[in-house]
Amino acid sequence: FRNCVRNIGDTSGIDLSSVTQAMSGAEPVRLSTIEAFEKKFGVQNLITPAYGLAEATLGVAIWPRRTPLRPDPSGKFLSVGQPCRGVSVRIVDEAGPVAPGVEGEICVKSPGVMQGYYNNPEATRRVVSPDGWLRTGDLGFVDREGYLFVTGRLKDLIIVGGENIVPVDVEEIVDHIPGVRYSAAVGIDSERTGSQRLHVVAEVREGADDTEALSGLVREIVQRVHQGRGHRPARVLLVRPGTIPKTSSGKIQRSRLGQMIAGGELGDRLVYASGAHRE
């Protein structure tokens, strides 16, 4: 949806009147993206946030079609709806279930939850409890009315100075900066500090090679992230389009991206990094 907003200029020949529903569920859906898409293409209540995973036979919660969306009080996250019929959801932390509105790991129980991973009982024990609750590895919260909000992936959390940073919060800031096509935030372990360091990778348009302009873009990214999140990125890496790895369903592969950064694998995909220009 975001690519449509950014890359389609003339919409006069586009007619979406026959489209009744468009579901979004690969990543936590952003209110700003939906609003921009619907405004640009002249549609309303078309995009439906949803949540599911293969281990739960896909559908866990699906927002009702043609129903106004439900943002959380901060306006950052959209509800994916109440659990589907026959599905139970609870949010837990290390101590157990948490109160409404508190973020934690999403756990699911339903007849559709898998019995286990094929020929892998150890992996099964890690994610499925003896009483049938599936640990999804996803972060979220449930409000007092029972609506589920998905905020990110537990394994993607960036811990800087003892504070948890959700990558999508950083990416939401960076993606709105002119000159950035797409971005990803990852945490890279630091042997010196024993903590993680925030790295921002931003794809810029093909042909962007003005050193002064790229340096200015890096400074703006650092400034805006610091203003919005209270942390300065340790490094900002500007890369060519298509560099950020994704799954077949469009999810950012942050662990793979972290490996690419730590292993120096960006190579000629790197355009500019923390003040160092790469031809």
Question: PLM features: residue spans?
Answer:
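Hydrophobic "anchor" residues
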Residues: 97, 106, 142, 148-150, ...
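Conserved ATP/PPi-binding loop(s) of AMP-dependent carboxylate-activating enzymes
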Residues: 79-86, 96-127, 163-165
